[in-house]
């Protein structure tokens, strides 16, 4: 971070139209993978006034009630009345999901599971830094926490005039690679028409902003932009069309690290867009947790139908205790980054994905979940269980 003095990241709430789409896509994936863990799923969603459309390609033996899944996601988010502009109980649901191409299947599937080829070509990045306790960049971490708190305040009734759609943005000031202050906070939240701007600003400042941002990072010149346009009554899919995969920077590192371009939601773990990005985070986080570097960005690339990565590269931005080449060797010795090996290493064949589809895929806490008879750990890529082995192998 030493190359920046200011850095800004944004996040959006679970009620943002693009995030509604992401959550629907991942809810469909979860429902299918709960019945058929080896299913191939690529589900895209579009939401707009009064309608949700799901499309994509699936190869599975499972049957799931897709319309019911879509409606439940929308209702659970809080779009349950025409008063808020969208109602999961009455909106139209269109399903145009088809079968996966046999050409893709023959390139991916193998008689030996460990030889499974990548589902597509592409490049993926993983990143970690020691500037927060979750080893994530501070601007995106604070941005996620603001919209998470907005949802908590809305759902608990703490601020009952809040509605589901919201966006946040945080600008952090850095000195010598460390966060020393927050220079600007933007929080725009949908609300009902009866609340005054004065009450809205006071409630958001006291019960959301000050609850999230550490007081020692705020200063006399910190800018607070709370609903800067004044009113935000019309929101959600009425205000904007929502699509799966349009918040890839929100989903990852808030722009602090590079991005290969592939979205996550709606894709089963055979798609390296998702699984290899999770593996990249796992590798980078363990490198930083081991004390091998203060910051680490790793790139992995694949060819469709080929198991072994076509490249692995790494950058510690001058913060490494070892050379980057030596750390890459440690990565190759300690992590198998073939697609099937990633799925096994991170235990990805479980219905865990809807939980990832809002408030970021990274910087989360591994949590035990139970779906039906299946008990598993979600967010396994956030574990630091390889740090000790890496530290020992590095001789630190």
UniProtKB/Swiss-Prot annotation:
Catalyses: L-methionine + ATP + H2O = S-adenosyl-L-methionine + phosphate + diphosphate
Q: In the Enzyme Commission scheme, what number(s) does this protein have? A: 2.5.1.6
Q: Where is this region: Flexible loop?
A: 100-110
GO CC list: cytoplasm
- What does the UniProt keyword field contain? ATP-binding, Cytoplasm, Magnesium, Metal-binding, Nucleotide-binding, One-carbon metabolism, Potassium, Transferase
- Enumerate the residues binding Mg(2+): 18
In the record, what terms sit under GO molecular function? Answer: ATP binding; magnesium ion binding; methionine adenosyltransferase activity
Q: What class of enzyme is it?
A: transferase
Subunit architecture: Homotetramer; dimer of dimers.
Name recorded for this polypeptide:
S-adenosylmethionine synthase
Organism of this sequence: Pseudomonas syringae pv. tomato (strain ATCC BAA-871 / DC3000)
